[in-house]
């Protein structure tokens, strides 16, 4: 058993080599399919991934979004993924015989009377045995070929033929059946469960059984969850004893067979990248359910609900029933007034008035409450109105019909979905408009690059022999975006993304405007029983006219928006692609592959530039080849044409020589020779070089050809930029322009503006650019706080020393006074680190542990400072008499760092300036009150004597314990209310105190940072003494 994994690995390697060798067979129809098959057949897991890529959702009949797949993996980790990749339900090769046409078709749904589910689980163990047998058969075929000399490839192909039934375990189980399949030691748990009208096979998770693959149960079961009145016990819908329902709603387009609005639109779409059509289809189905019945999803099914109670769920029907008596009263009043008019006139009115009278009554009745279509019936369900039968279908289909005429009128042939080779079902014909929009957006954003690459290279010759990786429709902005991202230049990024963002913004506005117009038409249509009767009287006729005008405006506004978009796209096409024409290729069985048992095929129309120059005139071909878009999208072809043109210009015919390529004579045939073409004749083609004077030493001819390419590129760029500028400015007024043209309401207030996405993206890019610029500036300064400090005053230690807080460049917390030094701990208190004036007495060091000191110690041993710095402006202060708590400790290095980083709040919170005095001042010191207060030495700058400066701000009103201003203004009372004047006076006082605090803090910060200038050099000792007295007395006057 130890050798089993190694043997299995060898078998897999051999199978891969042999499978890859089969691809060299000449009769391989498609190399890509063969490679995918080779990779797919290695293990059960790779087969599961391959089936997802080629045949969507082969493990289930009910399509689920990718979000469900992600959530299930979280609910059932490992188990769900293993079961998901090995499970097969929608597989014709396994179940085609038992279920003709596919297990997922409507005919092959689960029978409610005999409820069972058939599914298969892939076994790697059986697959390894099948591969081993294939290896043996291949070896025998090779040996036979050696002996007989025949070709062994047919036998090898037959040996490796993929027969899924050989390595799949097939199960047919009913609900609540469960089991375990062991695959190479890994258990695969499964259980069959019933979920409403579905039968599923699942695995175990944290929440119980997690469904993995499901299929529907046949209708009706036992009461339809889609049509509430469809019941097998209702004999009105049964015509035979087999309980076969004949309900007309059983086969409507939005029944269970349709797969929902998203799937219906996706299946009907003909573009490679589907974006907008599912949204529009879902909106249309919602409107149909709202206006007709919840059981239908299209106006084509309106006849299915005639004389049916399901109309009760219609909002329009309910409003019509409620307005029935009011409309009848309006009609009665109109008849009475018309009769009174005839009686008062005294003569018979003309016949046209009788005709207008009758037509008005019929019009109002038909479009407001409906006409009875069943003679003798009084049921409101028998009434059919003109809004449902005529107005809504005309308006809603007209929105898309008028716009599609403009959208498909592309001169270049790009994204035209109304050609003879493509057709839509009548119920989804409107999707041609949204396919054209999706195709345009995908083409300009480069979302269709991969599909165009494969189609253009493979479907021409059905192989990769002439594969050109560089020939795909990459939008030109990609070539600007790549260097912009690499260089980090946000200006290039903005320039590169300007046009795609504008395309996205205008496209989003078109979709939003169309949806808003459809919803607005629905709202106005529901109110038809209220506005239509106003048509009867001249006094209320204006309301009816406004109602009709709004309906028509909402019908035409999307067409105006589409006209603008197609104009913008056409100018863009001409600016970037010149006169290039696009060719389309209809792909059958496209990337999605066969869905639901190979019974459905989605055709995709892919567009690419037609490079068959025989279809162009000479002028159009040159315009296309010299366009910026063609050169960027086809670099190999452009380089080849450039080299060919250069050779033709260098190796040209002689001037004034008549050439005939078909002539037999070599001289007449004009075989090109080097140097025969003159420089003058070459330069004559370029008008912008007409002023060049030829002379000896002119440059070679071939580089001169670059002028033409550069000229074409610059002209294309200028045209594109000018187009972008015009369209950007015009798009800002697009909503108002459309409203003015149709005399309606502008949608700019209720819909996304045409420039919304563009402006938001540009603002994000600008913010990113500012952030990048800030990082660059920070990096240029060294990226560290030391450099920042150096630029603002030298080294950290020098700044501390110069401020009185450090003893050298090392930043140590030592302080010098008269040749004696006091050494404190690393985290010195503010009094020891910043106020050494009050701690050195008589040249003796004061212990740092002392907690009770005099605020003003002896001044006899201190000499006056020669150039004191001006003190900050004082605010209202108050000095207490006792020290209640020891001030928090702070190091000088922290003070410097906070100063350099402009952190005023941290500084004010760390420097506790509350200093109180417990002991009385000694008598010896009281005898000399006139002696001025001085600093240590001239080495200590007076600007950091913060005992005085910070003492000024310690009792400002509104400060909390962290020294932050917390007082807030109150604006609860309004003008005229009691207490309003007192409130405003208090607010003014708070503003004054806040301003004083901010001013004092700023001056204190400048003093600590050493940036305040020396403005007090003229002050004498008396000024300092007066300053001390004012502080001691609590005065709030400024010195």
Swiss-Prot record:
Domain of life: Bacteria
Parts of the chain that traverse the membrane: 326-346, 354-374, 387-407, 491-511, 517-537, 551-571, 710-730
Keyword Signal: yes
Key words of the record: Cell membrane, Membrane, Signal, Transmembrane, Transmembrane helix
Ranges of compositional bias, category Gly residues: 802-811
Keyword presence, Transferase: no
Region (Disordered): 654-680, 799-875, 917-949, 1004-1039
InterPro entries registered for this protein in UniProt: Conjugal_tfr_TrbL/VirB6
Family classification: Belongs to the TrbL/VirB6 family.
This protein's name: Uncharacterized protein RBE_1265
Species, as recorded: Rickettsia bellii (strain RML369-C)
Taxonomic path: Bacteria, Pseudomonadati, Pseudomonadota, Alphaproteobacteria, Rickettsiales
